């Protein structure tokens, strides 16, 4: 469907649609974001108006849209030619930065299109900053962020740019003036592939409610009134303790964006009663998208979940030229790990094989995935398994060779252009992982099962000319370390390797201060048991610390909590295994864990790609509730639509690493599918650089 006109207006106007039908009598409101916390009260910019019989509207002129903030528009209630007003309909369109829309108080953009598709894009991209208040024609969409997660990135304040990033995503998915999703991210040729078929399907699902007269009775997570709106609201009630059932279309889509695996209940055949039938919430939602749906080209079968996955395919990145250090850089290939810096820039570690690599390199991208650089295809240091960023402008990795090979080197690159700044030997055997503290020091351990000492590269010099001095510290392990993490006080957790069903987690206290961390005490240890395999060659491992100083560790069977017990002396104890959300038989892997801003733990599962891969997510505050495995759909130019139905067609086949940005998006690299996947808004906003060692949402 085309937009209403391409002629610029002095005041915002446009048209509202429910599918093919225009929305009459809908309440139109123009808002701007504010810097008053997550989902804080909206700022109304102009008096409300209503849509006419053609769905058209024009708002008052002379609008003062605040500098540094973002504008959006909503349509509440109205009817699409039915017998009565639908008080459950609430749609919106994200417009963008005030300074891009207005010259002084004069609107300089085009007429706006508001419908279900623009609502889907806004809900997924902006959901972490959005709340809904009021009801019916008085319903309000509040979009706000703390000052320190609005638009300015800084390590000295510190601050992030989550709201700016979220609006960038919304405008990169769907054109606000035509209501049409783009084929590629930001409508740029060769960029990430947008799942427009899934967006159309979600639009048709919303349309079933918008183009009705609304609900007729009570709707809960367990039952509904049988209306399209009632079914939508039941199926999008979050699967967490104490969750409220939504009462309008915007709230329903916000829930689905953040909980893409909806209600775990099974439902009756008519999708009205939970608990006794065989229908899933996903199939019930799919059933709302009828053959009369206005949005052409939707998925023709239910997806495995409702995650919105944008996929950058093999070969994307800097290929040749000034920012490619060799003519064979090649872009994304066998993507092995992903890291973010404090500005939400993205770094992908590449190789060509998981078992017999012949090279490694690093590709750097901006937050919008504009290619920035690619390091040379390094054929000497081919065993870098992970990369990390510091807060001084570097991305680095340690080559995991044996000490006898002489190739276990720390390699440090500039994040500005990918130039190699430092290559210095790491005097230990097969270091797999390294963590960076807030002072840019690098802590690492050997993965050798014969034992290892904690080592540190102390940072010095400048960003352009860094130096690193290595030292051996007091804490020692009897086995090899697979993963390390720092808690908020710079205490260290390590997960040891094991080839049995028992493995160890170790803890070393920071015996100095935060400003001058020191590690003068031995590791304290706890053992965990379950369906695990943590020897050096398999791929099941991971550990993260939370805001309270406890840790969560992963293995092939699932997730374990490690609790820090108050001393003196401080000790740690391990909890029971929390199983993966889906049982894969013997093909289970869970590794490279990450903690989002709400404290949820996530990590890629199923490394071998033999079955459907994805990102497993746990709500640890809700007793370790497994929220599901997020997969999404990949609309490939070559193979068509792949919705994670088999291992070979999943958007994430053999996912090897994940990271979360300040907007709450999950970035996932997958080796077998040779790509980078962005799950829009599927986590909570997070401080993007692990080296900031900050927990919780950016505030």
Model-assigned labels for residue ranges:
Residues 284-699:
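Flexible "stalk/tail and boundary" regions
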């Amino acid at each position: 469907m085309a937009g209403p006109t391409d002629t610029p207006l002095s005041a915002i106007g446009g048209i509202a649609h429910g599918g093919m039908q225009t929305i009459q009598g809908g309440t139109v409101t123009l808002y701007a974001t504010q810097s008053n916390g997550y989902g804080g009260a909206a700022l109304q910019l102009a008096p409300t108006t209503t849509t006419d019989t053609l769905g058209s509207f024009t708002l008052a002129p002379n609008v003062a849209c605040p500098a540094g903030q973002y504008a959006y528009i909503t349509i509440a209630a109205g009817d699409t030619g039915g017998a009565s007003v639908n008080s459950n309909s609430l749609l919106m369109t994200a417009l963008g930065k005030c300074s891009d829309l207005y010259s002084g108080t004069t609107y300089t953009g085009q007429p706006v299109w508001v419908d279900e598709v623009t609502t889907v894009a806004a809900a997924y991209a902006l959901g972490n900053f959005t709340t809904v208040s009021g009801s019916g024609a008085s319903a309000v969409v509040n979009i706000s962020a703390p000052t320190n997660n609005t638009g300015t990135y800084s390590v000295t304040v510190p601050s992030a740019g989550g709201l700016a990033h979220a609006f960038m995503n919304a405008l990169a998915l769907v054109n606000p003036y035509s209501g049409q999703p783009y084929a590629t991210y930001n409508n740029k040729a060769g960029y990430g592939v947008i799942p427009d078929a899934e967006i159309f399907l979600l639009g048709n699902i919303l349309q079933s409610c918008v183009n009705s007269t609304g609900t007729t009775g009570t709707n809960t997570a367990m039952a509904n009134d049988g209306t399209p709106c009632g079914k939508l609201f039941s199926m999008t009630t979050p699967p967490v303790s104490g969750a409220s059932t939504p009462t309008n279309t915007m709230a329903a889509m916000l829930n689905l964006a953040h909980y893409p695996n909806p209600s775990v209940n099974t439902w009756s055949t008519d999708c009205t009663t939970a608990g006794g039938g065989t229908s899933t919430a996903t199939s019930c939602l799919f059933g709302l998208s009828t053959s009369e749906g206005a949005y052409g080209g939707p998925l023709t079968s239910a997806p495995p979940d409702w995650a919105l996955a944008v996929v950058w395919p093999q070969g994307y990145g800097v290929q040749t030229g000034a920012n490619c250090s060799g003519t064979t850089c090649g872009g994304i290939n066998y993507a092995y790990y992903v890291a973010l810096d404090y500005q939400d820039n993205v770094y992908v570690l590449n190789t060509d094989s998981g078992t017999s690599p012949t090279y490694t390199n690093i590709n750097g991208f901006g937050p919008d995935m504009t290619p920035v650089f690619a390091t040379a295809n390094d054929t000497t240091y081919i065993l870098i398994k992970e990369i990390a960023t510091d807060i001084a402008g570097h991305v680095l990795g340690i080559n995991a060779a044996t000490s006898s090979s002489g190739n276990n080197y720390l390699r440090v690159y500039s994040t500005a252009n990918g130039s190699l700044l430092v290559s210095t030997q790491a005097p230990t055997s097969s270091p797999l992982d390294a963590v960076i503290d807030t002072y840019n020091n690098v802590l690492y351990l050997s993965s050798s099962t014969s034992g290892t000492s904690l080592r540190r590269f102390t940072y010095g010099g400048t960003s352009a000319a860094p130096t690193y001095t290595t030292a051996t510290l007091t804490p020692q392990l009897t086995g090899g370390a697979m993963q390390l993490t720092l808690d908020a006080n710079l205490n260290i957790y390590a997960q040891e390797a094991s080839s049995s069903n028992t493995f160890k987690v170790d803890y070393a206290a920071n015996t100095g201060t935060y400003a001058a961390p020191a590690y003068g005490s031995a590791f304290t240890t706890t053992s965990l048991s379950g369906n695990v395999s943590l020897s050096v060659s398999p791929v099941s491992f991971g550990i993260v610390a939370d805001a309270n100083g406890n840790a969560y560790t992963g293995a092939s069977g699932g997730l374990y909590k490690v609790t820090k017990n108050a001393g003196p002396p401080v000790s740690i104890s391990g909890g029971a295994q929390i199983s993966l959300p889906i049982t894969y038989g013997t093909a289970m892997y869970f590794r490279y864990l990450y903690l989002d801003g709400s404290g949820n733990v996530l990590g890629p599962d199923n490394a071998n790609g033999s079955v459907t891969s994805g990102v497993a997510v746990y709500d640890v505050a809700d007793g370790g509730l497994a929220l599901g495995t997020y997969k999404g759909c990949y609309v490939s130019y070559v193979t068509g639509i792949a919705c994670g139905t088999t291992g070979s067609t999943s958007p994430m086949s053999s996912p090897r690493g994940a990271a979360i940005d300040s907007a709450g998006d999950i970035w996932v690299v997958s080796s077998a599918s040779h790509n980078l996947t962005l799950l829009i808004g599927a986590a909570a906003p997070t401080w993007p650089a692990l080296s900031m060692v900050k927990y919780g949402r950016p505030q």
